Amino acid sequence: NKNETNVDNTITNMFKELTTNKNILFVLSANLSIEEMQNVKNLASKLNVDVSGYSPNTFDESFADDYLRTNDRTANRAAFKELQIDESKEYFDEKLNKASLVIIVENSYFENNANLLENKKVISLFSHHCMTIGYSNVAIPVASFYEKSGTYININGIKQKVISKMNKNNPMQSITTVIEDLKSMIEKGTV
């Protein structure tokens, strides 16, 4: 399948970038599942690199109402706290300043802040076409929210498991699969 070959080649290119860059920052979306966040965090730990959840653009004061009771437009921000992923501006600024490679995982912050990525290599993982892909050195398409399963923490702190019943023949890989493939390559030291 041509799509699988292209994705495999893209993952190989990402592996090469991960093994040749020392100062790496993963920037995660607060819409990822706990499993996706944990897998990225495990890979980052193996590589001894940094992970940030900074995403101030996902807050909207006009979004809250009597039912939602929050201005946070994300599905899983509480997972950052549970997994001890720093989402502060100070941490993000410090780590981004040092980074030579930035890996953006479904985080839309750079859509209007592309200038922050100048002189850096960029790898992006997105389920949809966006401006960030346009200035990425490597862009990996991943399954959308409706095509994947995972665990999310709701506004009341209750964990909810989401199970996808979408087309299982879809060639799009989940973020978890991409990250696990990369981790396996790194452990083996080869593509």
Give the location of each predicted region.
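Non-catalytic alpha/beta scaffold blocks inside enzyme catalytic domains
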Residues: N1-N23, A30, I34-V191
